[in-house]
């Protein structure tokens, strides 16, 4: 592995809209109590396994920022440098933002639902500017004209990977342990790149909330262990299965 640092990926803890099974995207919702507990536990896992981050990267969304703060506090690393970028934001779900996943699936059918939710290159319909769940008036995104109106995973790859290559890789090359606290789809975009996954294979990848995923990288920034290693594999498997089942009607 040489002097290359270690990369730790962490999806935010369960959010209010995760719990309600709503498409969230760029809507800025908070964490549930379960999500806050997941964040604290993630920091404990980092400390227990002596995987203490030197620098943190996160998005501009509070569910990631709060998760990062709670995790760092739990690991006694609140003092490390923090860098935030909209490029780490969740995928923008367009006009689906705020809609119930099960109701959307029932209305449009399984095939269309899965294409919008998990395909690599099929974006949902555009969100209307000025509508309840759009971000065009949000001051966080004034320098990017309010941000996208919809995105597919390919769009997330296109906005995130240049930031990873131009900014984050420098810390890894310097031998630092880098913690990225982000979102299901921004992390899927990065994992696709790291593990060189095909457009077809990425469809089946689900990332659970609140469980650190460790990547040891070689000098070419390729994973020593393909797919990385979850610090709590059993909980990660259960969490990924729960993510995969989203869209099922409630009993």
Curated annotation (Swiss-Prot):
A single Gene Ontology biological process assigned to it is: glycolytic process
InterPro entries noted in UniProt: His_Pase_superF_clade-1, His_PPase_superfam, PG/BPGM_mutase_AS, Phosphogly_mut1
Positions that bind substrate: 11-18, 24-25, 63, 90-93, 101, 117-118, 184-185
Q: Which UniProt keywords apply?
A: Gluconeogenesis, Glycolysis, Isomerase
What is annotated as the active site?
12, 90
Reactions performed catalytically: (2R)-2-phosphoglycerate = (2R)-3-phosphoglycerate
Q: Name one Pfam family in it.
A: His_Phos_1
Has keyword Isomerase?
yes
Q: Where is this site: Transition state stabilizer?
A: 183
Q: Which PROSITE patterns has this protein been placed in? A: PG_MUTASE
* Known EC number: 5.4.2.11
Q: Report the pathway entry.
A: Carbohydrate degradation; glycolysis; pyruvate from D-glyceraldehyde 3-phosphate: step 3/5
Instruction: Give the source's domain of life in one word.
Output: Bacteria
Q: Which GO terms describe its molecular function?
A: phosphoglycerate mutase activity
Q: Which CDD domains match?
A: HP_PGM_like
The record ties this protein, via HAMAP family, to: PGAM_GpmA
Family label: Belongs to the phosphoglycerate mutase family. BPG-dependent PGAM subfamily.
Q: What does this protein do, in the record's words?
A: Catalyzes the interconversion of 2-phosphoglycerate and 3-phosphoglycerate.
Q: Which PANTHER family match?
A: PHOSPHOGLYCERATE MUTASE
Q: What is this protein called?
A: 2,3-bisphosphoglycerate-dependent phosphoglycerate mutase
Top-down, what is the taxonomic lineage of the species of origin? Answer: Bacteria, Bacillati, Actinomycetota, Actinomycetes, Mycobacteriales
């Amino acid at each position: 592995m040489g002097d290359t640092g270690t990369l730790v990926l962490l999806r935010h803890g369960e959010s209010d809209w995760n719990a309600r099974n709503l498409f969230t995207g760029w809507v800025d919702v908070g964490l549930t109590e379960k999500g806050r507990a997941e964040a604290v536990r993630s920091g404990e896992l980092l400390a227990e396994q002596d995987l203490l981050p030197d620098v943190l990267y996160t998005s501009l969304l509070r569910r990631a920022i709060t998760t990062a703060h709670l995790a760092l506090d739990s690991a006694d690393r609140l003092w490390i440098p923090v860098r935030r970028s909209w490029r780490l934001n969740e995928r923008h779900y367009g006009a689906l933002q705020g809609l119930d996943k099960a109701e959307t699936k029932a209305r449009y059918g399984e095939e269309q639902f899965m294409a919008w939710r998990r395909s690599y290159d099929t974006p949902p319909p555009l969100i209307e500017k000025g509508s309840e769940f759009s971000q065009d008036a949000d001051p966080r995104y004034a320098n990017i004209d309010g941000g996208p109106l919809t995105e597919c995973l390919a769009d997330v790859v296109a906005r995130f990977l240049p930031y990873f290559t131009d900014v984050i890789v420098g810390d890894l090359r310097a031998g630092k342990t880098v913690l990225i606290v982000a979102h299901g789809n921004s992390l899927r975009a990065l994992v696709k790149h790291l593990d060189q996954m095909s457009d077809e294979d990425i469809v089946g990848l689900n990332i659970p909330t609140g469980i650190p995923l460790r990547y040891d990288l070689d000098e070419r920034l390729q994973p020593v262990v393909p797919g990385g290693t979850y610090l709590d594999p059993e909980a990660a498997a259960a969490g990924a299965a729960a993510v995969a089942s989203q869209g099922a009607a409630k009993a």
